[in-house]
Amino acid sequence: TGRPFTGVPLELREFPGMRYALTANGARILDTATGEILIEHLLSKESAKKALEITGKYDTLQEIYFDGQGYAKDEKLAHVERYHKDCNMWEYVRASRIAVPDIWELFNSREENLDKVQALFADMEERKAAWEELSECRDLNLVSSLKYNIEINAAGVNKGKGLIALGK
């Protein structure tokens, strides 16, 4: 899944026989029974900063993910409907992200690398422009599960490679 582990419904996290969770598009793979991180391919702080600077030029709800948890600016999260076009997802997003007053303050206060960055766009032309600019960054891998978002991982990170690595 592209979700962080905390964003996976509890029923699935505790489902009998589901031993592993491939999260954040393959950036983090863990043993659900023990909580042990088996594989990590994290986004460097430098690359994440670049992604945040680019997406921050636009009207976006930016999310950063550390250690399986998503964080978003409180003011933007309060208006998730402006950025997330699927009303069925509004409560999920509000419930699964931790609201913070300043995304940059949190980013700068943490030393570790990130699972991923995500930006939800209010305007699709702005999304297109951001995608083009982000695509020029060779240290980033871009995916989109929705017409209005960009999920940003470290280069080479994706669910397929994560499954192959887990299989080894």
Kindly give the residue locations of the regions a language model identified.
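Conserved acidic, metal-coordinating active-site core of Asp-based
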Residues: I54, Y58, Y65-K168
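Active-site phosphate-binding/coordination module
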Residues: G2-K85
